[in-house]
Every structure is written in C-alpha cells, then in structure tokens.
C-alpha cells in the first residue's frame, strides 16, 4: 500500500527515474568490451581492425558519458574532444573536455566545434573507429560555422527566422546548411571511418535528425528548401551577405548539399539512443507500482501550453476520485515531454515545471490525497536553481496564509516565488543529463 506521505513516495519515484537515465550508466549499459570485441547495442565490432579509436561529442551529459567510455575501453582511446555546458565538466584521462556557453552559443563553442571538426577530418580513415557522444544542449554547444561564416552571421539569421514566424523545422533546415557538423556533416567528415553515435534524447519522439541537429544522421532538407524558406518569410535580402552567398553557391552546385538518405558517407554509421524520456517514465512507473500505486502512462510526447496540460492532469485526478476512471485510486498518472510557457510583458521567475505545479494547485484546491509533481530531468527549470515543484490541494491555502495569491503568481509566470516560501521547490542540482520533463500525479483520495 502507498505510504501516507505522498511526497516521500514521489521522491522515491523521482530518484528511480533519474537513476535510470544516468549518463554513465546509460553508456555502460550500451557499450560492452569482450576481449577485442566491442558490443554496441547488439552489434559486435572487431577492434582488431581499427588502428585508432577517436571520441567526439557535445551536450550537457558529455563529461559523464566520456568518463564511462574511457572506463569501458580501458586505455584504447587514441584521442577525444567533447564540449559541454559551463560547469558540467569532469576529469578524464584522454578525452579533452571543453566548456562553452549554453543555451546561447559563444566563441568558445565555435572554437570547440571547429576543433572537433578538425580532429575528425584529420583522423578520418578506413581503420578509424569514431565514437560520438550526443546529449541535450548539443545543438548550441556543437557550433562550427561553415567556411566563410561567423557565429554572428548564424545568430543574425536565426533571429530573423524567429521574428518572421518560421517554425523549428524550417529554422533547423537553415542551421544545418550553415554548419560544418550539423545535418549529417560530421558523418561526412568521418567517412570512410566507422562511426557509432551514443545518443541521449532530449526531443519529443526521439527524432534522430533533431537531436543536436543530427550531426550523424541524414538530412532531408535541401539548398532549394533553404532558399524557399528565406524568400517565403521575406528575409532573403535581410540575412547577412555571407549566408546568402553560401546559399547561392549551394544552389549552383558549388557546395555539396547535406548528406541525404542513401549517401555513402552514412554507410558506416550506427546511431543508438541509450537514454530517453520513455526510459525515465518506464522506471518511474515501475517504482510507483512497487509502492502500491497502479501506474498509468498518459504520454511521453505531450507538448502544448503548460497551464493547459496541468489542468488536463488535474482533471484526470479529479475523475479518478469521482468515478474510478480511467483507473481507481491509489494510482499514479505519469507523462513526459516538454511543454511551453507563453510569456507576456510582465513576468516573474519560473519555468515550465513550476508553472505546471502552480496551475495544477489551483485546479486541485481543497482536494485531499492528490500530489502533483513536475520536474526537468536536467535539474534546471528556467533560469532558476530549482528542477520543478510539487503541489497539492492545500498549496493555494498555504500560500494565502503568507499573503501569496496563487492566481496572480500564475498570471505573472512567477511560480518560483510562490513555491519558495512554501518550501515546495524540488532542488536536485545539475543531473548532467536531459531527457526532457517528468510529470506525475499521485492519487489516493485519503487525508495525509
């Protein structure tokens, strides 16, 4: 049976979920060394045919992933360079860990990206095995503007696209064509070497071409698509001249397009997702069941406005208590994915997970035996030190006792400053991974 302390149960569920997507553990589970054989996700590679093993990568989880690869390969790595977010470094023996800015790229990211591109280019050979470590944040950290372009050129182009109303798929198509590494270009540099990518997914649906902008995956967009996007949004003449010149050269066939499905540059590439939101949610469900709750997965692909998603979850919790549908209490409703918060001109401090908890608190007001929890698996929710927050039927009343009006804080997107005085923030510290968000509703209907 569930304990009377819903927070204690939720804490155990959260810890189990985060442990299941630990970057080091994920790599070690996917990568096994048996003598001269390297087993990767069911495939066996004969290390005897490779003279050099080179490790490259980018993302928040890059350092623990690199440490794990070094431990598994035990002195066999020839060289390596991995770029991580500031403060996310860790000691390694052979692989060089470089830090750069995230989410806004900086010159250190450019230097790191070009350094990685140069290493891959220099080591590319039939008898080289490349291991590429990709995780959340990789797109902003793996910055290697194509020849003739500067970081400022790419930034200005992205700003114009965002202001014009272009969607993320259109923006990514442009980004890939302005990079030395994105959109399969890293794989092209590594050919004819063997390339294995170990990937921690931070995107809804685990789309390989989207994670870190798909440096080791075929790209379906073309130079023509890019030109059409810029023309359609009326910014062809506004983008920096070097960007327009590169597009024109691509259209004239003077610059190769990004690798497409079937391109020989991708023949020696294996892409393996070693950790994902679904894995975290599955482990959370298992832990909830051990604690006496009937788990139910709503979806791992939930997107949309945060407060609307919260109200849907709260409505399901109320339905469980009112009718026993879609399942009876005690139960645990779980979901994953990544929602969005639309900010107005007047906003405070918070993040999508804290906003979820606050919106849920308003819809659960006065309801006993329900706990709502939402957290970012990277340990960060918005520009704060919190990963998320928890809320229950008493949260609104407890806030009111301290002069905090929950609805006003929600309107101002100021959930951090609502939950902090209540001691209801979830503080995990940086987890050095990112598989999006985890949300759960524990429903018992019993007074704690």
PLM features: what roles do these ranges have?
Residues 126, 130, 140-212, 220-227, ...:
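Conserved phosphate- and dinucleotide-binding cores of soluble alpha/beta proteins
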Residues 357-448:
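Internal helix-turn-beta structural module
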Residues 149-167, 219-234, 346-372:
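Gly/Ser/Thr-rich active-site loops/lids in small-molecule metabolic enzymes
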Residues 47-49, 58-88:
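Active-site cofactor/substrate anionic-group-binding motifs, chiefly glycine-
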Residues 1-48, 64, 71, 225, ...:
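N-terminal amphipathic/basic leader segments beginning at the initiator methionine
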Residues 83-126, 174-175:
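Glycine-rich oxoanion-binding loops at beta->alpha junctions
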């Amino acid at each position: 049976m569930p304990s009377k302390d819903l927070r204690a149960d939720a804490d155990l569920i959260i810890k189990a979920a985060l442990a299941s997507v630990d970057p080091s553990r994920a790599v070690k589970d996917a990568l096994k060394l048996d003598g001269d054989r390297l087993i990767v996700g069911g495939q066996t590679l004969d290390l005897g045919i490779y003279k050099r093993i080179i490790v490259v990568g980018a993302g928040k989880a890059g350092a623990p992933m690199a440490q794990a690869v070094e431990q598994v390969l035990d002195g066999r790595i020839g060289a390596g360079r991995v770029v991580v977010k500031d403060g996310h470094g860790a000691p390694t023996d052979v692989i060089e860990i470089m830090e750069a800015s995230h989410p806004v790229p900086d010159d250190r990211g450019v230097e790191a990206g070009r350094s990685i591109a140069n290493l891959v280019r220099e080591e590319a050979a039939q008898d080289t095995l490349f291991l590429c470590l990709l995780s959340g944040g990789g797109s902003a950290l793996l910055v290697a503007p194509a020849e003739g372009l500067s970081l400022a050129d790419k930034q200005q182009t992205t700003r114009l696209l965002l202001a014009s109303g272009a969607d993320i798929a259109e923006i990514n198509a442009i980004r890939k064509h302005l990079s030395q590494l994105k959109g399969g270009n890293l794989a092209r540099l590594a050919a004819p070497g063997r390339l294995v990518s170990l990937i921690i997914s931070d995107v809804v649906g685990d789309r390989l071409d989207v994670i870190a902008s798909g440096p080791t995956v075929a790209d379906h967009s073309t130079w023509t698509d890019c030109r059409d996007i810029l023309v359609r949004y009326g910014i062809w003449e506004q983008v920096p001249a070097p960007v327009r010149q590169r597009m024109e050269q691509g259209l004239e066939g003077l610059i190769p397009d990004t690798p497409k499905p079937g391109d020989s540059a991708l023949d020696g590439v294996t892409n393996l997702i070693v950790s994902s939101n679904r894995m975290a949610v599955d482990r959370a469900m298992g832990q909830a069941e051990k604690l006496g709750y009937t788990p139910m997965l709503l979806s791992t692909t939930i997107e949309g406005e945060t407060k609307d998603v919260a109200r849907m979850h709260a409505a399901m919790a109320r339905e469980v208590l009112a009718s026993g549908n879609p399942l009876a209490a005690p139960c645990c409703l779980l979901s994953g994915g990544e929602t969005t918060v639309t900010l107005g001109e007047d906003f405070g401090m918070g993040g999508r997970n804290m906003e979820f908890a606050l919106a849920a608190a308003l819809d659960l007001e006065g309801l006993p035996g329900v706990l709502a929890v939402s957290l970012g698996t990277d340990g960060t929710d918005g520009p704060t030190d919190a990963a998320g927050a928890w809320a229950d039927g008493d949260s609104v009343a407890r806030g009111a006792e301290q002069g905090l009006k929950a609805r006003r804080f929600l309107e101002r997107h100021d959930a951090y400053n609502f939950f902090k005085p209540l001691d209801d923030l979830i503080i995990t510290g940086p987890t050095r991974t990112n598989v999006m968000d985890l949300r759960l509703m524990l429903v018992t209907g019993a007074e704690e």
